Structures are given as structure tokens and as C-alpha cells.
């Protein structure tokens, strides 16, 4: 019986740590199912300065206009073209993101095929970024609004104002 109690305690501790880290176990499971385990990711807590990356937003224009990472360049997803990144340095790290990381991973793979050497997907996308208390911007100013792609996806945003 003691071993069973210890197991339950350990489970609650692990789940509690996941929530304390700003990310639920279901969200982590979702991301694990969406991501290619061979594609490199960077977690928000690993980023000390966005200026060390060429930051690309792979969401649609309306999502970008609601808010985006401060130094992000909009490249889109449905309308993405390598012409939109022609001026970027293929040897400098690229950080690409979308809402949760699925669309950005797809565009990231296209960048790798085009010769970009260091492409990283932002783990958890803009939702995880904001849930970690990191800022987003609109028209050069901080904002609390975050486009969540759609109402069903908005359940994963725990901080900020949901827009869809």
C-alpha cells in the first residue's frame, strides 16, 4: 500500500511541476503528436535574446497583425514563398513560429531544403511563449492580445487575451 501511495504522490508531483512550468501534460502530449522529433526546437526559456535569431512568423497575416514576437518578420503559411526570405542570411539562426508549432515546422523544413543551416521551431508556438509570460507586440507596442487560430485552439492559451 505504501508503494501505491508513493506512486500517486509521484504522479501528482510530476503533474504539478508541469503546470508550474506553464505547460500542461495534455498540451505537451499534443505537441509531441504534432512535431517531427527530428526537427530542432527551442523552448522560450532557452531564449535570452531574440536578436540572436532571424525571427519568422508562419501564421496568416491577420494573426500576425493581432500580435507577434517583437522582431518577427511575417512570412505566412498558405502564401509562403522563398522570395520572402531571400534577404536572410542562411548561416544565421532562424527561429520560426506559429500558433503551436505545426505550420512553422512545415515552413522550417522548406527553409532547410533551401539551404538554411540553423532553423529552429519555437516549441509550443506563440501560445507557449505568452503562457511563459513573454511579451508580444502589435504596431510596435506591447499587447495582451494573442490570435489563437480558432476557438478550439484557444483552450491552450492561459495568459493574455484570446482573439480568434
Go through the PLM ranges and name each one.
Residues 101:
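Conserved G/P- and acidic residue-centered "switch" motifs that form tight phosphate/ATP-binding loops
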Residues 1-27:
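Bacterial Sec-dependent N-terminal signal peptides
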Residues 97:
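Short, surface-exposed ligand- or partner-binding patches at beta-edge/loop junctions that are enriched
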Residues 55-57:
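Structural scaffold elements adjacent to functional motifs in cytosolic proteins
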Residues 6, 104-105:
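Short alpha-helical patches at coil-to-helix transitions and adjacent helical residues
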Residues 21-44, 50, 61, 65-92, ...:
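Rhodanese-like catalytic fold shared by cysteine-dependent sulfurtransferases
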Amino acid at each position: 500500500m505504501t508503494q501505491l501511495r508513493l506512486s500517486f504522490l509521484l504522479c501528482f508531483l510530476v503533474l504539478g511541476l508541469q503546470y508550474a512550468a506553464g505547460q500542461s501534460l495534455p498540451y505537451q502530449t499534443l505537441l509531441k503528436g504534432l512535431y517531427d522529433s527530428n526537427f530542432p526546437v527551442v523552448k522560450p526559456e532557452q531564449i535570452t535574446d531574440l536578436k540572436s535569431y532571424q525571427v519568422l512568423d508562419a501564421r496568416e497575416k491577420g494573426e500576425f497583425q493581432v500580435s507577434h514576437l517583437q522582431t518577427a518578420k511575417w512570412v505566412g503559411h498558405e502564401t509562403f514563398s522563398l522570395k520572402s526570405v531571400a534577404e536572410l542570411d542562411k548561416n544565421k539562426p532562424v527561429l520560426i513560429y506559429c500558433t503551436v508549432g505545426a505550420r512553422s515546422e512545415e515552413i522550417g523544413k522548406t527553409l532547410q531544403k533551401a539551404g538554411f543551416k540553423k532553423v529552429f521551431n519555437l516549441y509550443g508556438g506563440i501560445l507557449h511563449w505568452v503562457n511563459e509570460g513573454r511579451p508580444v507586440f502589435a504596431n510596435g507596442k506591447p499587447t495582451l492580445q494573442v490570435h489563437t487560430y480558432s476557438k478550439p485552439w484557444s483552450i491552450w492559451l492561459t495568459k493574455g487575451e484570446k482573439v480568434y
